């Protein structure tokens, strides 16, 4: 008998009543968070049999929720969301004992703080790598990038604005951190504006600790024809380079060559304070039949997966000497739900709480 190698979703029962904008896994892949235009977010836990169970669902903003991200578990179960209502909200899971049975534990998501200093729609947020502490970068439709830091990593209710950068004078759509411990931290910002200013759609900043500021790297010029919908640094860096993948119509892969002055010493101390020279090399163009929307690296940085506007998930694998080959291609239309899944989906829609009831949850 031939085995069924088709890929099937774990679960088709939805939690949202409107368009889902973001799906985010925690660093261990055991938990998942989703957010949507219905102003709600949901937390999912993976069961031992591989299925996903919805453990929480609540209204978290006063507008459409664009992003939801997880902090590293070292800082606790912390989730951040950003929204059309111009705010960023930090949530933390708290374990409490049931009043009926003291041995039984229940979890609640508590709103720790609301960051509301943005004057426009917040389009993306990203936590820093854990070796930098509990920090977060955000970008908005006015082209501003803000960097926040929690001075006490055990207190998620206090966040200070430490830097504000004007990346563009047009809309910012995505922001990401470099993950390397060996080099000075980098932040890459992408613009999804159709008419980019001077054709600049990607800006990269370098953190110079001795100067206590983020410096724009003007030597890195990306010639990209389409708006930037996503960009990510590879989790694995070479000694002399970073790798950056950019979704701009197709998926573009770049190596960013690092100068010796940007490489940290073994104890994490910088070389003499000076601006480093970076060189940009385009190593691959991963074609997409439709506009690439989101992209991710795997843990080893050897596979890039992207989702497209045609509902297709494509994956490419790196071989050697900067060669990439297509690994797989899956389309959501190829999956036909069973009658049991259809009935479960309809049942979930009729039994879900009303939005007015969701407002009272965890507030």
UniProtKB/Swiss-Prot annotation:
Entry GO CC: lysosomal membrane; nuclear pore outer ring; Seh1-associated complex
SMART domains xref list: WD40
Entries under PROSITE patterns matching the protein: WD_REPEATS_2 (PS50082), WD_REPEATS_REGION (PS50294)
Keyword Repeat (UniProt): yes
Sequence ranges of the WD repeats: 15-54, 60-101, 108-149, 158-206, 223-264, 287-326
Localization per record: Nucleus, Nuclear pore complex; Lysosome membrane; Nucleus envelope
Gene3D superfamilies (alphabetical): YVTN repeat-like/Quinoprotein amine dehydrogenase
Keywords: Lysosome, Membrane, mRNA transport, Nuclear pore complex, Nucleus, Protein transport, Repeat, Translocation, Transport, WD repeat
Pfam families: WD40
A single GO BP: positive regulation of TORC1 signaling
Domain of life, per lineage: Eukaryota
InterPro entries in alphabetical order: Sec13/Seh1_fam, WD40/YVTN_repeat-like_dom_sf, WD40_repeat_dom_sf, WD40_rpt
GO molecular function terms listed in the Swiss-Prot or TrEMBL record: structural molecule activity
Disruption phenotype: No visible phenotype.
Its job: Probable component of the nuclear pore complex (NPC) which is involved in the trafficking of macromolecules between the cytoplasm and nucleus. As a component of the GATOR complex may function in the amino acid-sensing branch of the TORC1 signaling pathway.
Self-association and partners: Component of the nuclear pore complex (NPC). Probably part of the GATOR complex.
Family: Belongs to the WD repeat SEC13 family.
Protein name, entry field: Nucleoporin SEH1
Gene: npp-18
């Amino acid at each position: 008998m031939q085995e069924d190698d088709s890929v099937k979703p774990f679960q088709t029962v939805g939690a949202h009543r409107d368009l889902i904008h973001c799906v985010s896994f925690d660093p261990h892949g055991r938990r998942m968070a989703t957010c949507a235009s219905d102003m709600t977010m949901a937390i999912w836990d993976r069961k031992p049999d591989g299925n996903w169970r919805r453990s929480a669902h609540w209204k978290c903003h006063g507008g459409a929720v664009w992003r939801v991200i997880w902090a590293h578990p070292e800082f606790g179960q912390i989730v951040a969301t950003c929204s059309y209502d111009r705010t960023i909200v930090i949530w933390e899971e708290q374990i409490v004992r049931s009043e009926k049975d003291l041995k039984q534990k229940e979890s609640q998501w508590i709103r720790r703080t609301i960051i509301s200093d943005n004057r426009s729609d917040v389009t993306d947020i990203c936590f820093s790598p854990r070796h930098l502490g509990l920090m977060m970068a955000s970008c908005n439709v006015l082209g501003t990038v803000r960097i926040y830091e929690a001075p006490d990593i055990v207190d998620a209710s206090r966040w200070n604005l430490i830097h504000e950068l004007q990346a563009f004078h047009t809309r910012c759509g995505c922001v990401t951190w470099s993950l390397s411990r060996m080099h000075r931290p980098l932040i890459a910002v992408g613009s999804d504006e159709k008419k980019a200013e001077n054709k600049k759609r990607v800006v990269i900043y370098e953190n110079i600790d001795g100067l206590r500021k983020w410096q724009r790297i003007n030597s890195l010029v990306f010639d990209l024809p389409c708006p930037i919908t996503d960009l990510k640094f590879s989790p694995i860096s070479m000694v002399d380079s970073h790798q950056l993948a950019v979704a701009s119509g197709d998926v573009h892969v770049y190596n960013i060559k690092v100068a010796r002055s940007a490489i940290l010493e073994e104890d994490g101390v910088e070389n003499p304070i000076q601006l480093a020279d970076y060189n940009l090399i385009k190593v691959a163009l991963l074609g997409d039949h439709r506009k690439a929307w989101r992209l991710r690296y795997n843990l080893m940085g050897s596979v890039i997966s992207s989702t497209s506007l045609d509902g297709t998930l494509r994956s490419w694998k790196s071989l050697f000497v900067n060669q990439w080959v297509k690994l797989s291609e899956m389309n959501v239309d190829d999956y036909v739900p069973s009658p049991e899944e259809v009935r479960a989906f309809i049942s979930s829609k009729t039994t879900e709480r009303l939005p007015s009831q969701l407002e009272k949850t965890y507030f």
